[in-house]
């Protein structure tokens, strides 16, 4: 069966060898404004949009996610479980002709699996790259991107509630003491959020989202050069 | 870890028990205007959008697809392979609290797996439903929906090319002799396409897409009543 690789809105015939996978987290508190599956919803949105714009294959999502021990704001898995799920998707993706895999990751803790990517490349004789699109947790950037995608409940009252760091310590990780003690970058971000609070900035959300999609599209173009 | 189930744009706390899965096909000719992964791209778009609008979990896509023996316009798998992939996704979905699975299917041939849904329900003690959103193959409806989503190359010249049923027998299945002989419904549709041709109707595409998303959203609401 000869497939029509140049049909439709596709960059070129080679793009059919590229598979995009969304990675985030499903069970993670994000204050009042954002849902617990914020990270995977943002990752899925960006991954699918970039696939539509280029013709690359959208292979779905990785369900498990992982996190640093000292960050306690959700339910996560061991890095090995994320790795094992990736193995499954790559194995299935190879069956439909994918040779280059691009993982769009929108949850900071998943950076812990980057060390596995070389093993995947070696085992399956493929190319795997990961793009990390992450934000200060549940803060102005993520709230604004979430709003543009449609997952945020960002009325004035809920936003006010969201800024109650006592009640929602995960927001900006302001109230995650152990995380702040163990990670300087987290502590620095928390200080900024505590001082300036979390706002909804629709223009910012749009800009960040478009830049993120553009970044993935550029990476896909690079992968088929 | 207490998860904030009512946070964000979610119908209610129960919606977190609903998982949406996209099912289509990745390797199937769709004339000149549409790409070979049209069905899974449309299914993914509808499934993700409905998940965003309701708060249901988007669990990704099923990579294998199946087809009737007599329809030869792509590369497909046995129904059992689709079933086995669904088993994997359901097993993983249960781990994050999903109890009700909704499969958004945009490839007619996958109706062959409907007989497996009861087995899945029995094996995993869960609820599985499938919504079929299918069109006359690569014809006006699908071209128009594909255009709205962004996967179509629908300039005048390509559309003209698309209507060359000699060169693209799969369009409307006009030139798929075996399929038309074996299936009256396919034959009937092929006659209509042969007579009226394939056009781009942006308004129609928008209307069909919105209705499809609405249909999935209503089914999700029903599943959490």
From Swiss-Prot, chains A, B:
pH dependence as annotated: Optimum pH is 7-8. Has approximately 80% maximal activity at pH 6.5 and 40% activity at pH 8.5.
Reported cofactor(s): Fe(2+); Zn(2+)
Enzyme class, UniProt record, top EC level: hydrolase
Coiled coil: none
SUPFAM superfamilies for this protein: Creatininase (SSF102215)
GO terms under biological process: F420-0 metabolic process; riboflavin biosynthetic process
Keyword annotations of the record: Hydrolase, Iron, Metal-binding, Zinc
Quaternary structure annotation from Swiss-Prot or TrEMBL: Homodimer.
Protein name: 2-amino-5-formylamino-6-ribosylaminopyrimidin-4(3H)-one 5'-monophosphate deformylase
Organismal lineage: Archaea, Methanobacteriati, Methanobacteriota, Methanomada group, Methanococci
Primary gene name: arfB
